[in-house]
Amino acid sequence: MDFNGLSMDQAPPISAPLRFYLVAPLFGILAGFMILFSDVTMLSTRYSVDSVAIAHAITIGFLGFVMLGSLTQMLPVLAGVVIPKVDAASKVSFGLLVFGTLTMLLGLMSENMLFNTISLISLGVGFTLMIGVIVLAILKVKNFNATVKAMSTSLVFASVIVIMGLFLLFTYIVDDFAEYRYVVANVHSVWGIFGFAGILIIGVTFQVLPMFYVAPRFKQFCKKRVVWIISFGLVLWLVLNIYFDAYSYLAKIWIALFFWAFATTVWKKLDLRRRPISDVTVWYWRVSSIFLTLGSFFWVFDDYFDNQYTVLVGLFIGGGFIFAIMVGMLYKIVPFLVWFHLNAMGYMTIPTINEMINKNLAKLQFILLMFSFLGFVVTFFYPLFLEASALCFIASMMLLEYNIIAPVLLYIKIKKTKPDFDMSAFATK
């Protein structure tokens, strides 16, 4: 692994990111059961209550939690700054976000104004707290590298989509604003996918591929310009979508081209890595590159089909790209955190990162997840595959939870033993 340029001494307590990581698959399981017991006709449109609830069980409960956990871990290490009160802030934010997400799902599915109101407050405070402490840390950064710049940009988009999301939730409480729901929801989803998640993934990739896979570093043009180019495209799309909708496809093409270029670059970097050993995480990177390419261009051409295939676009980009790459990152980040923190405490005779998760179970989880994604795509045309696809998804999420709990249990077990080396002599007095 390449630790060049990292401030490992600034890493937060292991509990800060782990609490988000360990709960994420549970929301995936919940989303799977919601799909299993939903009416397939209700899932064929993005604006049905079932689709909205399931989408947010995944986007907030799984993707949001993984991204927030990663920000609390990676920002201090990459930028050399301390997130203020990170453990306390993450605990409070975590509790509010879990409670807020669950009450939102209940409120949407039961059309209960009380649950929706409670979730509006919980999610609003939870996101504001977490984003706020991260922004405070970013303001102290002196050396803005490419990854930190991408994180900062993604947080701007995150702030906007959180405000939009809270407004959209408010429209389920007060009907007077429901007429604005579809316009805001469209911007909310596009900026959430490409602006927050997409740009954050690009920034993290600049660091993760060279670090974990000993792949060639990205060129300076890519690291310095691509995030701004995509951001410009997203702002251009917003303006065109609102005022000149007939020309919004031009901005879509702009955005899709640069994400396709990113996907192609990732594929080539993986081909050129100095240790070409394939594991399930490499599979996830490659599959996500394919789904990103397909989804981006599906998104462009969906306009010519009166947006009939928007759900498929969401499956390709939200599922095949963002969801898949997050799972792949969990398989690297969780064992790394366990290994790093045990090492820092003086435990030297511990399993390596690659030994902490059962490789066969990880491969089985990958296969089940891919079957479920492909099954959901087929279900769009042939509804009889819904139940089987949902069951595959549930099983894959259960396996993912088991796989990432295994290193954590190992951490707890080893911590109860005596360290191989006494690190107290190096502690700051």
Please report, for each region that a protein language model flagged, where it lies by residue.
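Hydrophobic alpha-helical transmembrane segments of multi-pass integral membrane proteins
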Residues: 1-429
